[in-house]
């Protein structure tokens, strides 16, 4: 599942696209940029593909944002044998898992800080995702395990 959000900094908006594994809740791909566009979504997708090496025909769900509907993004999906799925119009519940992640990110990090520059926000978001959220943060839906700990118990 993939989606985008924005974080306001002293230099303007910094956009973040994330790819979430719905089963383990792990953020497997992400990218940040001052521009919310197809190259940003493609960067997050490529990171996810590199980390996961998904099986052909895996479904990647997103909302109907223009960056996810772009020909360039769809071409990269096709190159990796992935199938696109998009939310029903006006139905935020289709993206509930990643909207929950955005809520956690914002309430646990963003709303408590004022980021003067992009680099400051990038560093904090990187640490939140890679050090805290994926490795440490417990999820009730995962029997109170972190995403990485939950995945390690599967193998």
Model-identified regions with their sequence ranges:
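Charged DNA-binding/catalytic regions of mobile-element recombinases
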Residues: 1-155
């Amino acid at each position: 599942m993939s989606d985008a959000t924005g974080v306001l900094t002293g230099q303007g908006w910094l956009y973040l696209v994330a790819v979430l594994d719905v089963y383990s809740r792990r953020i497997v791909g992400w990218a940040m940029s001052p521009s919310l566009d197809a190259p940003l979504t493609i960067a997050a997708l490529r990171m996810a593909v590199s980390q996961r090496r998904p099986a052909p025909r895996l479904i990647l769900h997103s909302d109907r944002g223009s960056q996810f509907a772009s020909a360039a993004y769809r071409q990269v999906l096709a190159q990796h044998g992935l199938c696109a799925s998009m939310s029903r119009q006006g139905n935020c519940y289709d993206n509930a898992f990643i909207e929950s992640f955005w809520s956690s990110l914002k309430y646990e990090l963003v709303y408590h800080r004022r980021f003067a520059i992009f680099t400051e926000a990038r560093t904090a978001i990187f640490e939140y995702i890679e050090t805290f959220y994926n490795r440490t943060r417990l999820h009730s839906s995962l029997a109170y395990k972190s995403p990485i700990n939950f995945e390690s118990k599967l193998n």
